[in-house]
């Protein structure tokens, strides 16, 4: 069966965009609103018609993630180390989550509630983000393995930013689930880098 490398690449970009935003807000206290909105809304739509629809129907919404992937796929790249570390941690957590149907059920139900809340307040409203951050704490944070986020203490101690980080990690896990669903696996990151890199360049070129 042939792989849909574009779908695999889009889902990977979703992961790395969300984890880069985690690193960014942890270090600076700020988030680019459009990229943040894309990541959060990708989490809220659980029944999209196709992969691109998860990210608002436009690959340009994933420009940040695709540009990071372009750099990560270069030989001996040393940039975005924290983004990569968080991304690999997300893949590990998603694999753990896949074996917990009970937890998946809770997450699905709570995301439905958050989606309804977003219709009233907007997807990136503090109330919605607090709901999603709380969901991460009550579910994903109960696994033995946890992603340790590095950043400035003055930002990490703020409840609002802590909620944003947890909501973004949940969004990254959602993209990791999508990545698995469309045929993604970790071996591709080692042996099929050229196919993925070609898709990254093609998607960026068409923006």
From Swiss-Prot:
The keyword Cell membrane applies. This is High frequency lysogenization protein HflD homolog. It is a peripheral membrane protein. One of its GO terms (cellular component) is cytoplasm. It is found in: Cytoplasm; Cell inner membrane. It comes from Cellvibrio japonicus (strain Ueda107). Its main location: cytoplasm. InterPro entries: HflD, HflD-like_sf. Keywords: Cell inner membrane, Cell membrane, Cytoplasm, Membrane. It comes from the Bacteria. Belongs to the HflD family.
């Amino acid at each position: 069966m042939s792989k849909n490398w574009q779908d695999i690449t889009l889902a990977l970009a979703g992961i790395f965009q969300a984890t880069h935003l985690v690193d960014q807000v942890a270090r600076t206290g700020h988030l680019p609103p459009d990229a943040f909105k894309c990541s959060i809304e990708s989490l809220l739509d659980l029944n999209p018609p196709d992969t691109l629809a998860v990210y608002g129907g436009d690959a340009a919404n994933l420009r940040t993630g695709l540009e990071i992937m372009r750099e990560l796929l270069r030989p001996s790249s040393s940039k975005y180390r924290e983004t990569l570390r968080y991304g690999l941690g997300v893949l590990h957590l998603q694999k753990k989550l896949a074996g917990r149907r009970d937890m998946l059920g809770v997450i699905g139900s709570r995301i439905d509630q958050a989606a309804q809340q977003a219709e009233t307040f907007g997807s990136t409203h503090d109330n919605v983000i607090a709901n999603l951050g709380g969901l991460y704490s009550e579910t994903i944070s109960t696994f033995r393995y946890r992603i340790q986020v590095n950043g400035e203490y003055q930002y990490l101690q703020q409840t609002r930013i802590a909620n944003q980080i947890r909501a973004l990690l949940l969004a990254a896990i959602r993209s990791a689930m999508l990545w698995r669903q469309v045929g993604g696996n970790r071996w591709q990151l080692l042996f099929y880098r050229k196919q993925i890199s070609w898709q990254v360049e093609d998607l960026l070129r068409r923006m």
